[in-house]
């Protein structure tokens, strides 16, 4: 039965309900307060559940060497992979299991893959995501594709890394629904095989820190997508792109290969895409107001976006209604689009840009009418579709056999791919 809920705004660690700050009781509990039904002697302190000093003698793991697909830069230990979380084989495998394991949610119905399914462009292809108890969020599920190269996470960039991002959904009341991280860790600690893997990978028991690092490792590697038709063309396979895709590429803002003799009669960068969608991953990792979600009648943004992630007292008016530039790689797979999922197709996305966005006080200054013809708009869409990776991993390839509980029960990872209530 669905819970009766009030409208709430989520901020990690607290709920804003009716304008009041509500701190869940479990978060207020002291380190010495026992879990309900347990004695103080049997209880592990919250600190030990979140982080534990490793015992190096237990670690039995190997480095994981990854060669990214064609068109993507190396996973540099300096710029992409944190020194505190090097890639290892055991960590990747552990992260793969945790990613698809619904036991990370309060009622065992939601896994990371519920909202970030590899076969759906690492999203859920829904306007906004559905979590525990069929509760619906307010934002579109952002893709995990190539987040290895990301400088910040979430639409508003409120988390600086995949490691910190992985911890948020666990305690989001409309996603995985856990009141605190301690309960998640305790639940995973009840799985014998996880305890064994954590000892080998980290030299610790199951901890939140280890869970986050394993999940981040899996996402960095498994969600890499390159070797698209564009990458093949860029590498010298001139016939990899059609004439329409080549015209779209030029309109997008990219020059043709120097050995290509095709001469498209279109204006370079007329669509202005490369003002934001730049680099190997086609994103500037910055925040822009496109007018999506502006309520003209109320003269306000339905979602304040980046501004909400900035510290109170340090909020920039220019950040109001601004959201992070997503990658265009695999965009053909990850619709609907924009932070609220309001644009169903890439054609609708082009229509929005072509008209110059939606006027509002914080509209990005580069958002102006493009005056693209229908053919030009179609060509840009064709090019974006040509950015679909051909080496991406499918859900079936990645779906693991999950370890059983103490009583031998094995959760259904495939069932958790379907959002609750659908």
Whereabouts are the PLM-identified features?
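Generic hydrophobic/packing signal
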Residues: 148-151, 166-170, 188, 192, ...
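Short amphipathic alpha-helical segments with coiled-coil-like heptad repeat character
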Residues: 2-3, 205-210, 260
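N-terminal Sec-pathway targeting helices
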Residues: 2-14
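Hydrophobic membrane-insertion alpha-helices, especially the h-region
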Residues: 12-22
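Short glycine/threonine-rich turn/loop motifs
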Residues: 34-168, 228-344, 348-354, 358-361, ...
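A gly/proline- and charged-residue-enriched helix-loop-helix capping module
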Residues: 173-178, 187
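Signal peptide processing junction and immediate N-terminal pro/mature segment
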Residues: 22-36
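C-terminal capping alpha-helices of c-type cytochrome domains
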Residues: 181-225, 332, 342-422
């Amino acid at each position: 039965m669905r819970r009766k809920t009030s409208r709430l705004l989520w901020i990690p660690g607290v709920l804003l309900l009716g304008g009041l700050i509500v701190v869940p009781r479990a978060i207020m509990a002291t380190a010495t307060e026992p879990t309900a039904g347990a004695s103080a002697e049997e209880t592990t302190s919250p600190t030990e559940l979140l982080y534990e000093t490793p015992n190096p003698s237990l670690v039995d793991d190997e480095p994981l060497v990854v060669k990214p697909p064609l068109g993507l830069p190396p996973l540099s230990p300096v710029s992409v992979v944190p020194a505190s979380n090097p890639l290892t084989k055991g960590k990747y495998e552990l992260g793969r299991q945790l990613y698809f394991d619904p036991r990370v949610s309060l009622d065992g119905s939601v896994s990371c893959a519920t909202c970030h399914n590899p076969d759906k462009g690492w999203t859920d292809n829904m306007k906004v995501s559905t979590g525990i108890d069929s509760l619906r969020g307010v934002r579109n599920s952002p893709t995990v594709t190539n987040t290895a190269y990301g400088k910040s996470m979430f639409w508003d960039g409120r988390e600086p890394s995949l490691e910190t991002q992985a911890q948020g959904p666990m305690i989001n009341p409309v996603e995985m629904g856990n009141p605190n991280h301690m309960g998640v860790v305790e639940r995973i600690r009840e799985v014998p095989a996880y305890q064994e893997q954590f000892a080998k990978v980290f030299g610790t028991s199951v901890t939140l820190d280890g869970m986050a690092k394993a999940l981040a490792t899996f996402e960095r590697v498994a969600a890499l997508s390159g070797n698209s038709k564009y990458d093949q063309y860029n590498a010298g396979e001139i016939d990899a792109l059609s004439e329409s895709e080549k015209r779209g590429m030029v309109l997008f803002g990219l020059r043709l290969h120097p050995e290509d003799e095709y001469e498209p009669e279109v204006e370079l960068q007329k669509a202005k895409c490369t003002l934001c969608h730049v680099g190997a991953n086609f994103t500037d990792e910055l925040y822009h107001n496109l007018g999506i979600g502006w309520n003209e009648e109320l003269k306000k943004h339905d979602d304040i976006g980046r501004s909400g992630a900035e510290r109170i007292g340090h909020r920039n008016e220019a950040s109001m209604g601004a959201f992070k530039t997503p990658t265009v790689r695999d965009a053909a797979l990850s619709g609907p689009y924009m932070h609220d999922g309001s644009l169903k197709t890439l054609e609708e996305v082009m229509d929005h840009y072509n008209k110059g966005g939606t006027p509002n006080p914080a509209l990005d200054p580069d958002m102006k009418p493009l005056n693209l013809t229908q053919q030009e708009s179609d060509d840009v869409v064709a090019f974006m579709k040509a950015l679909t990776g051909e080496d991406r991993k499918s859900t079936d390839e990645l779906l693991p056999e999950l370890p059983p509980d103490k009583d031998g029960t094995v959760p259904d990872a495939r069932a958790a791919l379907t959002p609750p209530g659908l």
